[in-house]
Each structure stands twice: as structure tokens, then as C-alpha cells.
Regions:
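Active-site-adjacent substrate-binding region
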Residues: 125-152
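Generic non-transmembrane alpha-helical segments
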Residues: 38, 42, 46, 135-143, ...
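Solvent-exposed loop/turn segments at secondary-structure junctions
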Residues: 5-8, 56-60, 91-96, 122-125, ...
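Active-site microenvironments of hydrolase-like enzyme catalytic domains
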Residues: 3, 73-119
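N-terminal catalytic or cofactor-binding beta/alpha core of small enzyme domains
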Residues: 1-82, 93-95, 186, 197
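Active-site-adjacent mobile loop/cap segments within catalytic or ligand-binding domains
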Residues: 149-199
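Loop/turn elements at helix/coil->beta-strand transitions in domains of secreted/extracellular proteins
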Residues: 45-49, 80-85, 114, 146-147, ...
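Structural recognition of the beta-strand scaffold that forms the well-ordered cores
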Residues: 50-52, 85-88, 116-118, 150, ...
């Protein structure tokens, strides 16, 4: 799912999108939905069944985004009770005092956006999600040593109470390009897939 589906990236000249806010767009080919498409395709290549919800949960109201995405999550869990993992893809926003957006990239060439796992701890069972996050983080650090930023624990729920195996995944920041985010999604998918498949 994408609670903040309209979050987007810095686009190169000639590839601009129609903004719906600061570093936001309803254009699914340029926002988090596109990153989710990439992640879903890569996970599917490992034989993992994926339900990718392409809804713009923040389209009508940014403040209601988590409530809207929770309704989608609960609907999918009822429809597909075999769902084991729920990933909520976002992008970060890191800027200096002047508002200049930072670009979070790996040391590898070509560069990929860095990824961070955000864990909500204001609900029962958060430790199960954290165990998954640690396992995924360790796998990815062994595969792509500069891909992952530190895991962040915050006193929120982020809908992670809805299902065990829930992760909030931030793919890059507003200063990154979409191409860097797509590379990161592929790298993350590889590590996530190999973690849950026990490889």
C-alpha cells in the first residue's frame, strides 16, 4: 500500500510531472505507486504473490491518508487471509535550513536511493515487526552495504498494528531521482525476498 502515494521525487529537465503539492503528484508514473510497481514486479520474479494497492490514499486529504490506507489494508486482509506481509512504501524528505533537498544515495555505481525502515512502537506486537525489520536490514546490509539507513523507532502506529509482518519502507528522499528510487526498490525487493524465503 501507499499511505502517501502522491509523494514524488526530483525529476530531470524534460521529465517534469504535474505537481499536486510540494514534491507530490497524482501521476502514478512518477510517484510512490511507480516505485511500488517496481517492487511488486521484482518480488513476483521470486515467485512471491503480491497484491499491489495503487490507490492514492492521500489524494483527497493528506491528514486522512493513514485512515484511508488502513481501510484498504483491512479489506485486503479480509479478502486474502493468506497475506503475511504488508509494506507501506513512502519517500523521505531531508532538507537543509534553506530548503535545499538532500539526495540520499548509495556508494555503488549506478547510485540507488537509500532506504530506511520506520517502525511504529505504539501498539501491541510491534516487536514482531521489529524482528522482521532487523532480519531484512541485516540481509540488505550484507548484499548492498550502503543501501540501508538505520532503522527508526517512533511512538506511532503507522497502521503496523493491522497485521504482523508490517513495515513502513522509505525509499529515498525528495532530492532523489525516480530512477534512483526504482534501483533502490529492486535492491530492497531482492533482500526482502531472500529474507522471507530463507535464502
Amino acid at each position: 500500500v501507499h499511505s502517501h502515494a502522491s509523494e514524488s521525487y526530483t525529476m530531470p529537465p524534460g521529465q517534469e510531472y504535474v505537481p499536486s503539492g510540494t514534491f507530490r503528484t497524482a501521476d502514478r508514473s512518477c510517484n510512490m505507486v511507480r516505485v511500488g510497481d517496481e517492487l511488486a514486479a521484482e518480488l513476483s520474479s521470486y515467485g512471491i504473490s503480491v497484491v499491489h494497492d495503487r490507490t492514492l490514499h492521500d489524494g483527497e486529504s493528506y491528514n486522512d491518508a493513514y485512515e484511508n490506507s488502513l481501510a484498504s489494508i483491512q479489506s485486503y486482509l479480509a479478502k486474502y487471509p493468506s497475506i503475511v506481509y504488508v509494506l507501506d512504501l513512502h519517500r523521505d524528505a531531508v532538507q537543509d535550513a534553506n530548503g535545499t533537498q538532500y539526495k540520499l544515495v548509495t556508494a555503488e555505481d549506478p547510485a540507488a536511493a537509500q532506504v530506511s525502515l520506520i517502525m511504529g512502537v505504539a501498539h501491541d506486537g510491534w516487536q514482531d515487526n521489529l524482528r522482521l525489520a532487523i532480519a531484512v536490514q541485516e540481509k540488505l546490509e550484507s548484499q548492498s552495504p550502503t543501501l540501508m539507513r538505520p532503522i527508526t523507532l517512533l511512538n506511532y502506529r503507522y497502521n503496523q498494528f493491522a497485521a504482523p509482518g508490517s513495515l513502513l519502507v522509505e525509499v529515498g528522499a525528495a532530492g532523489n531521482s525516480l530512477d534512483e528510487a526504482l534501483r533502490a526498490a529492486r535492491l530492497f525487493a531482492k533482500g526482502f525476498a531472500e529474507t522471507i524465503l530463507g535464502r
